[in-house]
Amino acid sequence: MSQLKDALHEHTFVCVMEFVPKPSAERFAALEAIMARKQLCGWPLTVAIGDRVGSPLDMSPLDAFSSLDTAVPALLHFSGKDRERQDLLVQLKRMDNAGLDQLLILSGDRLPGHQPGQRPVRYLESVAALQITRQARPDWLLGAALNPFKYHEEEGAAQYFKAEKKLSAGADFLTLQMGYDDRKHQEALHWMRRQRTPKPLIACLMALTHGRAKMLEHVAGAVVSPSMRDILAAELDVSKAFAQTRSIERLALQVIGLKLMGYAGVHLSGIHDLAQFQALEQALHTQQGEIHTLEQWAPAWAASWQMPGLPAVTFNPPGAHWRLGESRVSASRTEQARYHVLSGLHSLLFDRSNWLSRSFGWAVTRPVWRTAQGARLLHQLERSIKRPLLGCDTCGRCRLEDTLYICPESCPKGLANGPCGGTSLNRCEFGDRECVHSVKYRTAKSVQQTAVLTDRLIPCIELPTRHQSSWPTWFDPTLTTTPEPCGSGGAPLRLAREEARTAPPKPSAHHSRPAHTKQPAEIDS
């Protein structure tokens, strides 16, 4: 059992030190000096090696690990940015060869240069990647991400719904997005304790200064309120040294508070050399001698965010106050009507039981559609109908029934299981639209279909199935040309076909079915 797995299993508080690999001997030397300490205040130390934080051309986590002169306990990251299933399987084999068995799986933030409508960029979604990895490596320690720092109901509730899917898909622990709102930290912990099988939570932290706050404005999903920026600016006005000292003291205080709340550990970002590490350790030693309960901690945390002449800090964006459990929103009449119309059409044409559906199924499974020209014509017909109406990209295996008729391809990342962590007040990370998963949440809530958002684990789309009609395989799964169902763990295709052939008809959607650069942290759903 690995050090991190041991610590989580034994309920030992753990410190995960984030390292973003760059081709710099100084950075590697600094990391090795920190990791040589092996502990932070007696807590076991593990390095987390980031993946594609800046660009796909960054040094890979495996190459970075291999570059270390001394082997250290390591948690590698896998980012789904511009990746397919095969890329993940290759990394698993390479990790086997290196003797590594711990992986933090992320969908990833926006790939630099990715512009919707230009070159398609695929993101291997974390839920599907977790399924693939869990089935391929059942004994590995797998983590995923959760961003609880959401202040509108749609994006916040959808985050927790997707987190439930991640647990079902095989996550052993969740690492939170970087954040400073202690009420949101407690909210996430209370949510986890209500799950059927609670898992450990690790909080991502960074010592926050005015300069870093400005940088975080460009990090998807990170929240630094105007109130926080005012206080950080006031600290800098005193002196840079004063601001730096306050940031380290706050970081130490936050670590202590999270430990008292019941977090399994912390994921520390932005500590780049031994001097910073030692300064944090000294601050922790001092404050541990003074603070022993949450009742003692809360006023100390509030005081750490006070400056003369400024009001008390508020961590939430102005006018946005949602907390888990609050129910305020509903789908518009248009959104509800759209769902009911499309659900009705689906029942007529695709439920496989009424005469119209059987006739349509017979028509689209004729041998003529398996010729090159026939397949091309059928693909063009389906695309011409569904793309203007739904944003469809003819992925070859239609998932509309599982997504309340809101096409996953209308998300710039193509995410089907729920939102990434990069939304801001319901706005997509790309900034050009409302997050489609916020619309999906409102719709599900209004039509009593929220179970769909937690129970249906939607596999990724295999590359060979893209840009062909989904209709023939909907009615006759034996017609599929996909080499292996994504997330199958490599089950032979003939078995998958046999299961599909003998499975009962798929229910209507009326019924739920169980089941850039410059980034200090890459935690994203």
Regions found by a protein language model. Name each.
Residues 5-9, 26, 33, 108, ...:
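Active-site pocket-lining/capping segments in soluble small-molecule metabolic enzymes
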Residues 55, 378-504:
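Metallocofactor- and cofactor-centric catalytic cores in central/energy metabolism, strongly enriched
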Residues 13-30, 74-86, 143-158, 234-249:
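Active-site mouth loops of central-metabolism enzymes
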Residues 5-9, 35-42, 62-71, 92-100, ...:
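Acidic (Asp/Glu)-rich catalytic clusters
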